[in-house]
């Protein structure tokens, strides 16, 4: 068709044939058409691509949203489980506490019922006993009157004659008592003759003083709060068992608020446990592995403290040149007591006393101090080694000391072996001075109570005694007697009999005053 137009089209004024113009025109039109089609196709392609990208983004966002929703759901479920478990645990604890309280209330109620029943039984028993006593007393009065009449008939003596005979007998007893007291004064006067010899000892006492500590078998460690008790006990008691096994002591965790008691007869173990427990409380990490670590460190610190204490004690006692083994063993005495007196302080005091006595007697002061300082070294290991502390101490000193004077002073100061050297007498005298001075030592509470009880039992064992009281720390006994059974002369005789029984049956320091009190009241009314 283009050829037709090109052949038939006339020429234009521009010189181009019409067919050429038409061809150009149609080419332009066709280009526009194809360009439009290409543009439409390209635009469709772009739109399809954007649509696919948008679909992928939407799919990814949907997947992310599902994952996030799943995480939120899992977290919410975990929180719900945690809250439910916490609530169940708290509920169980409250139920357990309520059950415990209910058991305590039941136990207290049962105890009160038992006490009430016992009180009723005691009341009934006392009533019956009172009736029996009244009947017995009436019978005794009747028997007494009958026996008095019978005695007068048998003895062919009146009451006045019997009193005269009794006074003569008492006069003889008083003469014997006077003779005994005269002998006591004679002994006392002879003892005063030795006062000059004791002057050396008194001068030594005036120049020496030391502190005294109380003997104990327990230590109390304070706690920041009662919650710490549960942490110390641990799950199923594993922490407290680990601590007791590592230290060798007993831990007492009771109702005492904010406190734990350490009990042991070994003072070194007790000190190790105290330091370890204090560190665990401060640190807060309490479990068996940590307990073992802290106890090991505490043992090292206590050993170091014992060495330091031994060195300090040797310096205070004026004893120099001791071997490190002796210093360490002497340091153990810091935690050892005897009748309330610290043995290390006692050793320092004996060393100073021995040096002073030695200087007065003109012997080697250095050796006297050394023997006095080491005289009780056996007490540091007497829990672990068989034998007396003097034998143990002498054997230990023989290993480390070359001086025979020091060995004799240690071995002979308690007269376990025959005392043949002056060193044994010096150390023995210094030891007695340090131990016997007022306030240095005191008997244990158990022995003290036993002695008071024994005094009261002796007094109560006599007929006619109503009540007896041991007072003034056992230095006096006051006896209340029944006035209708014991008269004034009988009270005097009772006092002497009790004194004799105490002298024969008890050992006691100093003197014991026996006071018999007889009180008679006569009441009448004027009408």
From Swiss-Prot:
Membrane topology according to the record: Single-pass membrane protein
Top-rank taxon: Bacteria
HD domain mapped to chain residues: 343-436
Regions crossing the membrane: 21-41
Compartment(s): Cell membrane
Domain KH intervals: 217-302
GO cellular component, one term: plasma membrane
GO biological process assignments: mRNA catabolic process
SUPFAM superfamilies assigned: Eukaryotic type KH-domain (KH-domain type I), HD-domain/PDEase-like
Pfam families: HD, KH_1, RNase_Y_N
Signal sequence extent: none
Gene Ontology MF terms: RNA binding; RNA endonuclease activity
InterPro entries linked: HD/PDEase_dom (IPR003607), HD_domain (IPR006674), HDIG_dom (IPR006675), KH_dom (IPR004087), KH_dom_type_1 (IPR004088), KH_dom_type_1_sf (IPR036612), Ribonuclease_Y (IPR017705), RNase_Y_N (IPR022711)
Function per UniProt: Endoribonuclease that initiates mRNA decay.
Family recorded in the similarity comment: Belongs to the RNase Y family.
UniProt protein name: Ribonuclease Y
Organism: Dehalococcoides mccartyi (strain ATCC BAA-2100 / JCM 16839 / KCTC 5957 / BAV1)
